[in-house]
């Protein structure tokens, strides 16, 4: 009896093992049969999640990015053309023509300055002011500006003119393949206004020619172009912020309008302290909501 009692669990155990093995084989077989379906379901689930994530963030901003690249290329193409006219006048010794072409040529650059700043040394090579870099490395527009307005001569500027044009053409070549995304655009818009606040509205940028308002206007235009490309996405997420930014761009441009002079702008020296104060106030009023655009867009 004891023997039978002792052997019964062994039989049960053996039977259990056998049944378990069969069960495992069936489960494995079922798993193998279900794997393609499960994989398909998992893939569909992942794709659905990705689509939902993209919908949650609003957009991948491809249209806006493509639009900004096209805008940048258009501006840089014209920048190269106008810079060549300017440098030709410098090399020809035509002081008056060189002075008249200086500020208009720079506007094309100032509108897309975030692009140049993203390309290493190109921005300081083209746009560094006296004191921004070592004296031996100073070149670009402001080096020539000093000679034209302070020294009243084009002498000794031929090499600087050639190098400036070469740098402009290099900028054009590099923009074709550079990475541009919504983050660069949003950051760039804010940086353009920071540029205005730190140097243009103070009259420090064009310390010899006093053509700061050209740069001021171009920076604002560049920032507005970025906003225009992203405003539909922004409005979908925060209608009030979108309207606030639009209104404050309008207010700033209205404040700047009286200083237009034909196709250009009056000398910065003609601005009164009250004029500078109003421009600064309108600039600050725009900068604050514009700085929130990136967070709302999720970039």
Give, region by region, the residue ranges found by the protein language model.
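Generic cytosolic/nucleocytoplasmic N-terminal low-complexity/intrinsically disordered segments
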Residues: 2-3, 30, 41, 105
